[in-house]
Amino acid sequence: MIIDALSPFGRGASAPLAGRTILQIVPPVDVGGDERTTLAITAALAETGARALVATDSRELAGELQAIGGLFVRFPAATKNPLAMTFNMLRLQRIIAAERVDLVHVRSRWAAWAAVRACRKAKRPLVTSLPGDGGRKRPRTSFETAVAEGDYVIALSEFAAGRAEGLFPATPNRLRVVRPGMDLSKLQPERVTGRRVSDMRARWGVAAHERVVLMPARLAPARGPQTLIEAAALVKSRGLDDIRFILAGEAAKPVFARELDALAVKCGVQSIITRVGASPDPPAAFIAAAVVAFPAADAEGVTRASMEAAAIGALTIISDVGAAREIIAAPPHEDAEARTGWLVPPREPAALADAICAALALGASARDAVRRRSRAKIAAAYSLERMTRDTLAVYAEALER
């Protein structure tokens, strides 16, 4: 079930939340998507008249939470120690009682076990959030199944919801799809200055005439950089001599970085492939590139960055795994006239090379049309406003049970 503006749960969600105390439990996070989501939900709760608490070990959140009307509660949400998890259950019971919590939303799979038991003891509704890909293996212990034991279970995509139904057969009637939200105001191409773009290209060391194929992802096997290197060799063999491939991300392990360098030499493309660190200015990087590629090897490799690239209108290529079809519209799943990017089979360098060449060959009008459709598709499904509205609708539904 996808909660949207037309859903009865999307209307008037603020009414049952006014005056309620909502506790979010999140693991320590770096600055990025998870942290932004927590802050956005906190701000939305405050606007509805609810009292918003956030239990986490991330002290960096404390100041920002207070500025938007939230309250910080120190809580070791990321612990995997069974004894510590038992103590967490007792901590949560005390927090729920002392703060008169009406509903708990846990975004940490490890804290879910404690939250399930604390909420049952307190007779409070619980919302849980699944991992981004819905989970990759059948759970064997109560610690692993707890994330699907909420009164309502949030999945970040239809793909994740479908996978969860297979892993957790008892969840279908409790599953709700709430897609990630992004601050689209920061992903407007007109807001990216020429100076930012030129600075990015200078950082990469590319010449003015060179077109860039960018892979903005952590360099790990699941992200598929090997496939891109092999595809680069095929692109080069087709006579395209003005293309540079930029791998913008930190290596998961130094040995893997060396393996990638060795593969580039083996494929004869070491002169056109450059490894750089993670981009300090992703919007400028997307605009500076002719094509942005995400050659993920599996569902785990479909990242938030692919949504951001599509949101700003970059010509985006994604492996056809996980939730990729929800991000990109492309044949054969959609009509060619509806194309917003390219979907390619994972681990197939030839298919990736074909998509890169097709994107690079587009004329100006066709390229602009793909970009407009891409921006519109992402804006309709992945806005911060939609995410907060749909999340609060799940809270309201849980409280009205």
What are these regions (language model features)?
Residues 366-381, 390-393:
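A short, well-ordered alpha-helix in the C-terminal region of glycosyltransferases
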